[in-house]
Amino acid sequence: MEYFDMRKMSVNLWRNAAGETREICTFPPAKRDFYWRASIASIAANGEFSLFPGMERIVTLLEGGEMFLESADRFNHTLKPLQPFAFAADQVVKAKLTAGQMSMDFNIMTRLDVCKAKVRIAERTFTTFGSRGGVVFVINGAWQLGDKLLTTDQGACWFDGRHTLRLLQPQGKLLFSEINWLAGHSPDQVQ
Protein backbone atom coordinates (compact mmCIF):
# COMPACT_ATOMS: atom_id res chain seq x y z
CA MET A 1 0.00 0.00 0.00
CA GLU A 2 1.31 3.43 -0.95
CA TYR A 3 -0.30 6.63 0.34
CA PHE A 4 -0.10 10.04 -1.31
CA ASP A 5 -1.12 13.66 -0.79
CA MET A 6 -1.56 15.57 -4.04
CA ARG A 7 -0.31 18.80 -2.42
CA LYS A 8 3.05 17.14 -1.64
CA MET A 9 3.64 15.26 -4.90
CA SER A 10 6.36 16.26 -7.34
CA VAL A 11 5.16 18.03 -10.48
CA ASN A 12 6.38 17.28 -14.01
CA LEU A 13 5.79 20.04 -16.56
CA TRP A 14 4.70 18.99 -20.04
CA ARG A 15 7.04 19.58 -22.97
CA ASN A 16 4.36 21.65 -24.72
CA ALA A 17 3.85 23.84 -21.59
CA ALA A 18 0.09 23.20 -21.71
CA GLY A 19 -0.03 21.48 -18.33
CA GLU A 20 1.62 19.36 -15.67
CA THR A 21 1.39 15.84 -14.26
CA ARG A 22 1.65 14.33 -10.79
CA GLU A 23 2.34 10.61 -11.08
CA ILE A 24 0.58 8.59 -8.37
CA CYS A 25 1.89 5.10 -9.15
CA THR A 26 2.87 2.67 -11.87
CA PHE A 27 2.83 -1.09 -12.04
CA PRO A 28 5.32 -2.62 -12.12
CA PRO A 29 6.76 0.09 -9.85
CA ALA A 30 9.44 2.36 -11.29
CA LYS A 31 9.15 0.86 -14.77
CA ARG A 32 8.90 3.04 -17.86
CA ASP A 33 7.16 0.21 -19.74
CA PHE A 34 4.24 -0.06 -17.29
CA TYR A 35 1.13 -2.26 -17.31
CA TRP A 36 -0.92 0.41 -15.57
CA ARG A 37 -0.34 3.95 -14.34
CA ALA A 38 -2.36 6.48 -12.34
CA SER A 39 -1.75 10.22 -12.42
CA ILE A 40 -3.35 13.61 -11.89
CA ALA A 41 -2.96 16.26 -14.59
CA SER A 42 -3.56 19.99 -14.51
CA ILE A 43 -4.37 21.34 -17.96
CA ALA A 44 -3.84 25.06 -18.56
CA ALA A 45 -4.22 25.30 -22.36
CA ASN A 46 -5.81 23.52 -25.31
CA GLY A 47 -3.70 20.72 -26.76
CA GLU A 48 -3.32 17.03 -27.57
CA PHE A 49 -3.03 14.11 -25.18
CA SER A 50 0.27 12.23 -25.35
CA LEU A 51 0.12 9.03 -27.39
CA PHE A 52 0.54 5.65 -25.65
CA PRO A 53 0.27 2.79 -28.19
CA GLY A 54 -1.48 -0.34 -26.91
CA MET A 55 -2.98 1.48 -23.92
CA GLU A 56 -6.45 2.55 -22.83
CA ARG A 57 -6.88 5.85 -21.00
CA ILE A 58 -9.73 6.65 -18.62
CA VAL A 59 -9.90 10.33 -17.75
CA THR A 60 -12.10 11.85 -15.03
CA LEU A 61 -12.49 15.60 -14.62
CA LEU A 62 -11.91 16.47 -10.95
CA GLU A 63 -12.26 20.25 -11.02
CA GLY A 64 -12.33 23.25 -13.32
CA GLY A 65 -14.30 23.88 -16.48
CA GLU A 66 -15.63 21.16 -18.73
CA MET A 67 -13.27 19.88 -21.40
CA PHE A 68 -14.23 19.09 -25.00
CA LEU A 69 -12.43 16.02 -26.38
CA GLU A 70 -12.19 15.37 -30.11
CA SER A 71 -10.63 12.46 -31.99
CA ALA A 72 -10.99 13.01 -35.76
CA ASP A 73 -13.96 10.90 -36.87
CA ARG A 74 -13.94 8.58 -33.81
CA PHE A 75 -15.66 10.72 -31.17
CA ASN A 76 -16.56 14.15 -29.84
CA HIS A 77 -17.16 14.18 -26.10
CA THR A 78 -17.66 16.83 -23.43
CA LEU A 79 -15.89 15.72 -20.26
CA LYS A 80 -18.02 16.68 -17.25
CA PRO A 81 -16.99 16.60 -13.57
CA LEU A 82 -16.72 13.14 -12.00
CA GLN A 83 -17.89 11.27 -15.12
CA PRO A 84 -15.11 8.88 -16.26
CA PHE A 85 -14.53 8.58 -20.01
CA ALA A 86 -12.43 5.87 -21.69
CA PHE A 87 -10.65 5.95 -25.04
CA ALA A 88 -7.73 4.31 -26.84
CA ALA A 89 -4.52 6.13 -25.88
CA ASP A 90 -2.93 5.49 -29.27
CA GLN A 91 -5.23 7.88 -31.13
CA VAL A 92 -4.80 11.63 -31.46
CA VAL A 93 -7.20 13.29 -29.02
CA LYS A 94 -7.44 17.06 -28.84
CA ALA A 95 -8.58 18.67 -25.60
CA LYS A 96 -10.23 22.08 -25.61
CA LEU A 97 -10.92 23.86 -22.34
CA THR A 98 -14.36 25.44 -22.15
CA ALA A 99 -14.50 29.10 -21.23
CA GLY A 100 -10.70 29.02 -21.05
CA GLN A 101 -10.81 27.58 -17.53
CA MET A 102 -7.94 25.45 -16.25
CA SER A 103 -8.96 21.89 -15.39
CA MET A 104 -7.60 19.06 -13.29
CA ASP A 105 -8.21 15.42 -14.13
CA PHE A 106 -7.45 11.93 -12.89
CA ASN A 107 -5.95 9.56 -15.46
CA ILE A 108 -5.63 5.82 -15.35
CA MET A 109 -3.92 4.02 -18.22
CA THR A 110 -3.82 0.27 -18.73
CA ARG A 111 -2.07 -1.94 -21.25
CA LEU A 112 -4.88 -3.46 -23.32
CA ASP A 113 -3.35 -6.95 -23.57
CA VAL A 114 -2.68 -7.27 -19.80
CA CYS A 115 -5.32 -5.53 -17.68
CA LYS A 116 -8.41 -3.32 -17.67
CA ALA A 117 -9.44 -0.52 -15.33
CA LYS A 118 -12.86 0.45 -14.08
CA VAL A 119 -13.29 3.93 -12.57
CA ARG A 120 -16.24 5.00 -10.44
CA ILE A 121 -17.21 7.50 -7.77
CA ALA A 122 -17.99 6.07 -4.31
CA GLU A 123 -20.22 7.85 -1.81
CA ARG A 124 -20.44 5.16 0.88
CA THR A 125 -18.30 2.55 2.64
CA PHE A 126 -17.16 -0.33 0.42
CA THR A 127 -14.67 -3.20 0.27
CA THR A 128 -12.46 -3.88 -2.74
CA PHE A 129 -12.06 -7.30 -4.29
CA GLY A 130 -8.97 -9.26 -3.33
CA SER A 131 -5.97 -9.84 -5.62
CA ARG A 132 -6.64 -6.76 -7.76
CA GLY A 133 -4.79 -3.48 -7.96
CA GLY A 134 -6.44 -0.17 -7.30
CA VAL A 135 -6.22 3.53 -6.62
CA VAL A 136 -8.41 5.80 -4.51
CA PHE A 137 -8.45 9.60 -4.45
CA VAL A 138 -10.56 11.55 -1.94
CA ILE A 139 -12.65 14.25 -3.57
CA ASN A 140 -14.21 15.30 -0.26
CA GLY A 141 -15.03 13.92 3.16
CA ALA A 142 -12.99 11.77 5.53
CA TRP A 143 -12.32 8.11 4.74
CA GLN A 144 -10.62 5.36 6.77
CA LEU A 145 -8.36 2.89 4.94
CA GLY A 146 -6.84 0.44 7.41
CA ASP A 147 -5.30 2.59 10.15
CA LYS A 148 -4.89 5.60 7.84
CA LEU A 149 -7.25 8.61 7.65
CA LEU A 150 -7.62 10.02 4.13
CA THR A 151 -9.09 13.47 3.46
CA THR A 152 -9.51 15.77 0.44
CA ASP A 153 -6.69 15.46 -2.15
CA GLN A 154 -5.22 12.37 -0.46
CA GLY A 155 -5.32 8.78 -1.59
CA ALA A 156 -3.66 5.40 -1.85
CA CYS A 157 -2.73 2.75 -4.38
CA TRP A 158 -2.12 -0.96 -4.01
CA PHE A 159 -1.18 -3.84 -6.25
CA ASP A 160 -3.28 -6.59 -4.65
CA GLY A 161 -5.32 -7.48 -1.58
CA ARG A 162 -8.73 -6.74 -0.13
CA HIS A 163 -9.29 -3.31 1.43
CA THR A 164 -12.22 -1.58 3.13
CA LEU A 165 -12.74 2.16 2.69
CA ARG A 166 -15.01 3.50 5.40
CA LEU A 167 -16.75 6.86 5.04
CA LEU A 168 -16.48 8.61 8.42
CA GLN A 169 -18.88 11.49 7.74
CA PRO A 170 -22.49 11.68 6.56
CA GLN A 171 -21.29 12.66 3.06
CA GLY A 172 -18.15 12.21 1.01
CA LYS A 173 -16.92 11.35 -2.46
CA LEU A 174 -14.00 9.20 -3.44
CA LEU A 175 -12.72 8.28 -6.90
CA PHE A 176 -11.94 4.56 -7.06
CA SER A 177 -10.14 2.79 -9.88
CA GLU A 178 -9.96 -0.98 -9.81
CA ILE A 179 -7.48 -2.88 -11.99
CA ASN A 180 -8.61 -6.25 -13.32
CA TRP A 181 -6.02 -8.62 -14.79
CA LEU A 182 -6.95 -10.36 -18.02
CA ALA A 183 -6.87 -14.16 -18.25
CA GLY A 184 -3.32 -15.47 -18.12
CA HIS A 185 -1.98 -12.39 -16.29
CA SER A 186 -1.55 -11.54 -12.62
CA PRO A 187 0.59 -9.17 -10.53
CA ASP A 188 2.73 -12.13 -9.40
CA GLN A 189 3.76 -12.91 -12.97
CA VAL A 190 5.01 -9.42 -13.83
CA GLN A 191 6.92 -8.19 -10.78
UniProtKB/Swiss-Prot annotation:
One Pfam family matching this protein: HutD
InterPro entries attached to this UniProt entry: RmlC-like_jellyroll (IPR014710), RmlC_Cupin_sf (IPR011051), Uncharacterised_HutD/Ves (IPR010282), Uncharacterised_Ves (IPR023482)
PANTHER family xrefs: PROTEIN VES
NCBIfam families for this protein: PRK11396.1
Family: Belongs to the Ves family.
Protein name, per record: Protein Ves
Organism expressing this protein natively: Escherichia coli (strain SE11)
The encoding gene: ves
